[in-house]
């Protein structure tokens, strides 16, 4: 859908700054990660779209071939993948509430936000799907 309104694509890498801008009416709409998206909803901001509805996985772990060419680097990568996948399993089995203290400390989330977090599923590291590659390529055509 096209709009006549003037739209600017800006990038703010700090999610806490993005949330503050929304809460202070300095920005009209933006993508938020959890737990910031939950905080925005609690404070009455409407959710226009939920990225989980898109059925696309755009998270990426990208490495240079030269960066994993020797045995030591391959072992480091294998250990990283194993640790990441175990963390996903733990989050999926125990839920975010089991890590509420870490989320509160690292993400500056309050108790109400922590209690309202949605049930999320975390995927293991896997090669990109063709549909995700196509979606990423399409996004950069604009």
Predicted regions and their residues:
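Ligand-binding cleft/hinge of the Venus flytrap
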Residues: 1-11, 41-42, 100-103
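Short helix-initiation/N-cap motifs at beta->coil->alpha
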Residues: 3-24, 35
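Short beta-strand->loop
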Residues: 8-10, 43-59
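Solvent-exposed loop/turn segments at secondary-structure junctions
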Residues: 16, 35-38, 52-56, 67-68
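A ligand-binding cleft/hinge motif common to bilobed small-molecule-binding domains
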Residues: 28-45
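A bilobed periplasmic-binding-protein/Venus flytrap-type ligand-binding module shared by bacterial periplasmic
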Residues: 58-75
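Secondary-structure end/capping motifs
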Residues: 71-142
């Amino acid at each position: 859908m096209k709009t006549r309104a003037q739209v600017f694509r800006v990038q703010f890498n700090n999610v806490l700054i993005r949330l503050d801008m929304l809460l202070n009416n300095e920005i009209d709409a933006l993508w938020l990660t959890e737990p910031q998206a939950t905080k925005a909803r609690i404070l009455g901001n409407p959710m226009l779209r939920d990225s989980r509805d898109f059925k696309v996985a755009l998270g990426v772990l990208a490495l240079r071939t030269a960066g994993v060419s020797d045995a030591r680097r391959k072992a480091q990568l294998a250990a990283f993948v194993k640790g990441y996948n175990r963390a996903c399993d733990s989050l999926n089995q125990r839920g975010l509430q089991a890590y509420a203290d870490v989320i509160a400390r690292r993400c500056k989330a309050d108790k109400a936000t922590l209690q309202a977090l949605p049930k999320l599923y975390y995927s293991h590291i896997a090669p990109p799907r063709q549909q995700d590659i196509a979606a990423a390529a399409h996004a950069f055509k604009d």
